[in-house]
């Protein structure tokens, strides 16, 4: 019986592969279109692979299982899309529909060559279920592309806009691609609907389950008013339209920002796995071999690694990175997406599909600007937001390495860098004074600090690594002293390196001075290993990140907030109630504690353990925290900006109703206290470090 129905179906509507016009079989056209489409696509992809092959090496094949998991989570699962809810939902609908309907499109391509072709088992109940899913998906995708096109073309959210000097606007391209996707949906609905309408007009039952209220359902009932000849025309015409759009779409993708449709899976698979770290100067070159390199960093396009060029290909130009970038927010000449857009345009110009290569010279000065690259605080907000895990910090650090190698260092950074080379700290103060922040503790409280270096070196289980700002800045020394008291109260056997300690070099490396960083790292590593400590604690997230991510073979490193969290969990410390319980506290997540090291809960648990403390959250908190302005060398840099990040952050705290801003980073303290002054909030809002608050409230 089923065979008879199929035969009757074939008699009603002639399938495209069997149709002729003026005696010419259309199957010839349906063979030519895929051949040309696939050949052209292969040529374009080969050209796009050329820059990747010429690029610098990059090691991205480790931890295969984790990479597969990340690909399933971020690329297939669209994990980060809902962070921008409307755009995210629209993208998820289109992506899910794309996954379901790609199988349909491939089947149709084959059906144009082999009449009546269906996939194995698709003539059973499996095919019925798939057809229902296909019709629902096509309807949802069509609605989504219409909404997305109106949103992109009419409402034009601010984050999509592109200043003319920074690259071309992609609105027209986005709407064109949405139109092609919508065209594929409509073509398939009319192709399927014309066949179903023909059978309905003849009263012949089909095996196709027409799901109510889908696009195919509406089209089918609309077409029942048409003649058999019209239905035949629709069947062949819309099949041809589908073929042309499908292969045009395929070949258009690698020509612009929609290349991410093809590259995103690969880009996420090869994502950076070690957050907070910085790539080596060159893969395959050890630290000991750096002296042999003729050039450092990125100066020309081919100096980028192949993964970073893949990043350029994969950017969807959604603007999320720039929308979250604090440098962009305060008017600095930096928006991460424009680095990608300009470099991708440069790549397409330098490696065109057919003309000769267009070489525009070095990147800095011709494509990218010095101030643009120095404006970045390496806070990681852009990378945290990107749904395709595009990396910016490593590119910026490599560009800075190239500029430093060419002597292109901002005037405001030259003095602190020279001081770091001579004295091991950016303030130019002597090494002998590095441990003097502990003297008031001995004088006023009788606490003597162990010095774990020098001829009279003592021994201890734990090293408290102060770093430069805690050692030399009068205000921040109070944070070190509070940390000292807390460790003493907890009965910890600890000490400091004193004169043997050098700056951790965290910002030195991220500002491109690799050889200076290596020198600081070598001296610190030797001093730490010689001390014989089994663990390191620091109150500085930048030092934490450097010692954990940039150094090798050190004892375990812990931020003081993690230590306090553990002490609370073990019941080893208790707090007395706050005296002034009318204050409203808010916690500011330091970038290098939160985004780069994923320490969000420990400081909050500590705060919530203090009786009577009323805590609120800022809108931009945790992994969306707003950078205070940057630490280390960024304190010395004089950027072009309309306002200060610290001032903006204080305003956010004020809007949350806070009267006390708590942070867990000495650099955040400097910037936030400055922000309180410049925003006119003195007397209304105050700032305190987590360890200072704990020092006040701990029962000793």
Predicted features by range, described:
Residues 183, 219-229, 280-281, 285-288, ...:
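Iron-sulfur cluster-binding electron-transfer modules in prokaryotic oxidoreductases
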Residues 33-40, 141-145, 232-269:
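Alpha-helical membrane-embedded segments
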Residues 60-61, 65, 83-88, 122-133, ...:
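Membrane-interface segments at loop-to-transmembrane junctions
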Residues 41-59, 110-114, 147-162, 189-205, ...:
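Juxtamembrane/interface segments at transmembrane-helix termini
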Residues 92-104, 175-202:
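Hydrophobic alpha-helical membrane-insertion segments
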Residues 5-154, 303-312, 334-338, 347-555, ...:
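Iron-sulfur-cluster electron-transfer modules
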